[in-house]
């Protein structure tokens, strides 16, 4: 019934016009699972390797034919005849066959696409939705929740061609009673933000994740125009809508000088000074979550940041932890941050992703499920968020179908589950 009879890989195009890997897993029962690997722009140095061809004459070197060949060759040969329901075994076969610590032979993009396609095929064979299958794989059958969205409505940093240093300014519709209502609040704020920006003569062009990408006078101004938009939409900042930021500070950290160089504002900071700068912003605005507030290697600075802000703010490690249980375990032991961002392709398989979520939750850390700046119509992260009851999701703004695909899947899931999947809002955020 759930025996694998064929594994197929192909090169498709992602939301930034770059190739990525799509995989299909076919079962003897006729069921097929299909999934695509996302791709990041601001990446942690310790992420699993995304295998690119490097042939400058083709897709400027970004082709993924080598990764696709791994899917159609050694991965397919190893998996045919195996039971798709045994997700951990399937993932381990691919990891062992690759034989490297960072999936450098086949590419995390190849292994992940097959891993997720396998989960989808197994769910279909069990006649259950993907989120329900994920809950079973997670050891929490029937336990679901709808995630609080973090909507990236102003893009800066590596996600936009503008002068804003901080990469993401997000809103969270904490006053909503349901996920669907939260999306409505987000959409209304998003449209009002367009009006606010236009009234000030700013561009309303969007960045990689669907948020606006204007040139602003400062990072504080980004928060100010969002505050105006929230009010214009008829909501109360701090009550109906809270704020979150992804600094992606590794992108503006000068390793040689050991300083944070915010070129957009013409300011430089030491680790400690930047922590106090963030504290000041959090005092001025109802910011409840800060991601990658320092460089991924600045563990001393992160420890200070956690001591300074960790009791009142969610401090999320993305480049810091890269969805890796070994690195997360070190962070937990040292008391660094209090939350982890979960990105499938940072680690490269569903099984390892579930292990990172479990480790975080067991330690009292929150887990925020996340997209990447390079996405496809694949909406698996929506099912992951619900199936692990993670509580929070980052999947961009209220524009670009590669972002909205995930929100629409969440709407469908909420409709199907009803009261079985509560929307807990701000209660999901660490420190709130």
From Swiss-Prot:
Pfam families: Enolase_C (PF00113), Enolase_N (PF03952)
Binding of (2R)-2-phosphoglycerate, residues: 167, 343, 372-373, 394
UniProt GO BP: glycolytic process
Principal localisation: cytoplasm
Active site: 209 (proton donor), 343 (proton acceptor)
Pathway(s) per entry: Carbohydrate degradation; glycolysis; pyruvate from D-glyceraldehyde 3-phosphate: step 4/5
Cofactor(s) recorded in Swiss-Prot or TrEMBL: Mg(2+)
InterPro entries (UniProt xref): Enolase (IPR000941), Enolase-like_C_sf (IPR036849), Enolase-like_N (IPR029017), Enolase_C (IPR020810), Enolase_CS (IPR020809), Enolase_N (IPR020811)
Keyword vocabulary terms for this entry: Cytoplasm, Glycolysis, Lyase, Magnesium, Metal-binding, Secreted
GO cellular component terms attached to this protein's record: cell surface; extracellular region; phosphopyruvate hydratase complex
Cofactor details (free text): Binds a second Mg(2+) ion via substrate during catalysis.
Taxonomic superkingdom: Bacteria
Catalytic EC class: lyase
Gene Ontology MF terms: magnesium ion binding; phosphopyruvate hydratase activity
Annotated positions binding Mg(2+): 246, 291, 318
Annotated compartments: Cytoplasm; Secreted; Cell surface
Catalytic activity, EC: 4.2.1.11
Catalytic activity: (2R)-2-phosphoglycerate = phosphoenolpyruvate + H2O
Family per record: Belongs to the enolase family.
Subunit structure, interactors included: Component of the RNA degradosome, a multiprotein complex involved in RNA processing and mRNA degradation.
HAMAP family named in the record: Enolase
Function: Catalyzes the reversible conversion of 2-phosphoglycerate (2-PG) into phosphoenolpyruvate (PEP). It is essential for the degradation of carbohydrates via glycolysis.
Protein name per Swiss-Prot or TrEMBL: Enolase
Species the sequence originates in: Aliivibrio fischeri (strain ATCC 700601 / ES114) (Vibrio fischeri)
Gene it is expressed from: eno
